[in-house]
């Protein structure tokens, strides 16, 4: 059963803390699982007689150091050439681009409405997963962004072609990092233009030049388009601490049998 947030001071032995927790929890717990751990915050422990780690997801980040020009020069030639070509086309057509960044708590309700309109115009609407400003998901994002903005820890990026809103990012922040939670773009824009990529280029320049953050994080599982912007990918993980080593062995055997029955590979990460 879920217990709650795991929070510990740096330098402490996580295994020793878990073993002490076994004695403090009610009943007779056999396994304590710490899930979705970030190796940047807590290094992945080696496997041991009563410790087993499992891969969760790969996730991506950009270290905002060294200046934008050096960063941009390190991006793929195709990305740089493609976006330059798009900007030239927009200029020939007399279409000005504009990046706006909103941080005011009072601006977050409209931001969620604008985001919902963008996402609702695309494939997510057909799949039933698009954010809607008036549903539970939309209300959650509004409340969360307003609360974070009151702590100066939220931002919304809007990108325009002329007066038309064509792409958005919803972001949260802490002292050192900005996290891109969600991205949407206008899918009615001609396929020869990539508003989300054009927005990302200008947003990256702004972040490098601003110097406020040490890194940008792409929330969630790494996607193909993330790899156009960074090579920094790390694997988040789960770690199981077992009361006895025999339990770890039995758990691994059970999962291996299930995988064989399903025809899946039986290699165990960190076994």
Which residues does each predicted region cover?
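A conserved beta-strand-loop-helix scaffold within acyl/acetyltransferase catalytic domains
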Residues: 36-192
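Active-site/acyl-donor-binding loops of N-acyltransferases
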Residues: 43-74, 211-271
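Flexible, glycine/proline-enriched loop segments at strand-loop-helix junctions
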Residues: 5-11, 70-75
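Short catalytic-loop micro-motif centered on adjacent basic/acidic residues
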Residues: 31-33, 100, 215-217
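ATP-hydrolysis module of ASCE/P-loop NTPase motor domains
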Residues: 18-41
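Conserved acyl-donor/pantetheine-binding loop and adjacent beta-alpha core of acyl/acetyltransferases
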Residues: 1-5, 177
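Aromatic (often tryptophan-rich) hydrophobic motifs at membrane interfaces
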Residues: 9-12, 19-23, 130-251
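Intrinsically disordered, low-complexity proline-rich regions
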Residues: 2, 12-13, 28, 39, ...
């Amino acid at each position: 059963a879920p217990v709650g947030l795991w929070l510990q001071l740096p330098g402490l032995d996580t295994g020793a803390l878990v073993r002490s927790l076994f004695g403090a929890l009610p009943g007779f717990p056999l396994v304590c699982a710490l899930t979705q751990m970030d190796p940047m915050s807590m290094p992945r422990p080696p496997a041991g007689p009563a410790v087993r780690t499992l891969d969760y997801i790969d996730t991506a980040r950009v270290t905002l150091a060294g200046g934008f020009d050096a960063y941009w020069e390190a991006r793929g030639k195709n990305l740089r050439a493609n976006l330059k070509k798009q900007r030239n086309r927009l200029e020939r057509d007399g279409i000005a681009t504009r990046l706006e960044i909103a941080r005011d708590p009072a601006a977050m309700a409209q931001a969620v409405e604008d985001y919902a309109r963008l996402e609702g115009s695309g494939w997510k609407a057909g799949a039933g997963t698009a954010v809607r400003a008036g549903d539970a998901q939309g209300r959650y994002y509004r409340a969360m962004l307003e609360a974070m903005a009151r702590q100066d820890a939220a931002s919304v990026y809007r990108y325009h072609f002329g007066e038309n809103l064509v792409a958005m990012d919803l972001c949260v922040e802490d002292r050192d990092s900005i996290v891109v939670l969600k991205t949407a773009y206008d899918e009615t824009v001609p396929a020869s233009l990539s508003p989300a990529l054009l927005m990302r280029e200008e947003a990256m320049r702004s972040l490098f030049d601003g110097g406020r953050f040490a890194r940008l994080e792409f929330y969630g599982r790494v996607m193909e388009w993330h790899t156009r912007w960074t090579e920094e990918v790390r694997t988040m993980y789960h770690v199981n601490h077992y009361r006895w080593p025999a339990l770890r062995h039995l758990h691994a055997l059970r999962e291996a049998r299930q995988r064989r029955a399903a025809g899946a590979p039986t290699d165990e990460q960190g076994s």
